[in-house]
């Protein structure tokens, strides 16, 4: 059985939580929990409330996601 593909969404960081976790409001209005990807962590990219980000969500758990990109300029 093939692995399901991940879905990509745009959103805005609403709240910063401990352990590099964030609450992100997607463009469709849904708020999910997200953590940063390894490359963002490795390059010490800061994510603050109000930042526009790209999120990857697995079809198996639609309540959690991974931040893969922070948009430059709000």
From Swiss-Prot:
InterPro entries: NA-bd_OB-fold, RNA-binding_domain_S1_IF1, S1_domain, TIF_IF1. The keyword Protein biosynthesis applies. CDD domains: S1_IF1. It comes from the Bacteria. Residues 1-72 form the S1-like domain. Belongs to the IF-1 family. HAMAP family: IF_1 (MF_00075). Component of the 30S ribosomal translation pre-initiation complex which assembles on the 30S ribosome in the order IF-2 and IF-3, IF-1 and N-formylmethionyl-tRNA(fMet); mRNA recruitment can occur at any time during PIC assembly. One of the essential components for the initiation of protein synthesis. Stabilizes the binding of IF-2 and IF-3 on the 30S subunit to which N-formylmethionyl-tRNA(fMet) subsequently binds. Helps modulate mRNA selection, yielding the 30S pre-initiation complex (PIC). Upon addition of the 50S ribosomal subunit IF-1, IF-2 and IF-3 are released leaving the mature 70S translation initiation complex. This is Translation initiation factor IF-1.
């Amino acid at each position: 059985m093939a692995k399901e593909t991940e879905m990509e969404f745009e959103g805005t960081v609403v709240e910063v939580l401990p352990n590099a976790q964030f609450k992100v409001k997607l463009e469709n209005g849904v708020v999910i929990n997200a953590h940063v990807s390894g490359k963002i962590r490795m390059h010490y990219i800061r994510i603050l409330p109000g930042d526009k980000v790209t999120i990857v969500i697995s079809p198996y758990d639609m309540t959690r996601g991974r931040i893969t990109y922070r948009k430059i300029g709000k």
